[in-house]
Design a protein with these regions (language model features):
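Domain-level signature for soluble enzymes in the chorismate/prephenate branch of the shikimate pathway
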Residues: 1-106
Length: 106
């Protein structure tokens, strides 16, 4: 028989997951900022819509394969926001490039 967890236990579990998500999001954005710096050094535009499209397609496919309670479209919307915030972090990191592309969520 499956263990029945209390609301408090489930909330504690969510708190742990939230902390893991925040840590992973910060690692992801730090990587994106570093990529942005390298693109600047190489004279490449920061905003590369084809790469973003590829990322969104990959996460949509992953969401479809995992078939959890979040729809694939919901996962795509979440990642659109993550990409927006990564681009915002690149801007705030002091990159001089003007080509950051549009913010999806604005």
């Amino acid at each position: 028989m499956a263990e029945v967890l209390s609301i408090d236990e489930l909330r504690e579990r969510i708190d742990v997951i939230d902390n893991q998500l925040v840590r992973l999001l910060n690692v992801r954005v730090a990587c994106a900022v570093e990529i942005g710096k390298l693109k600047h050094e190489l004279g490449m535009p920061v905003y590369q819509p084809e790469r973003e499209k590829k990322v969104l397609e990959k996460v949509k496919q992953s969401a479809q394969q995992l078939a959890g309670p979040l729809t694939a479209d919901a996962v795509v919307r979440i990642f659109e926001r993550i990409i927006d915030e990564a681009r915002r972090a690149e801007r705030e990191s002091g990159s001089t490039s003007e080509d950051f592309g549009p913010l999806i969520g604005e």
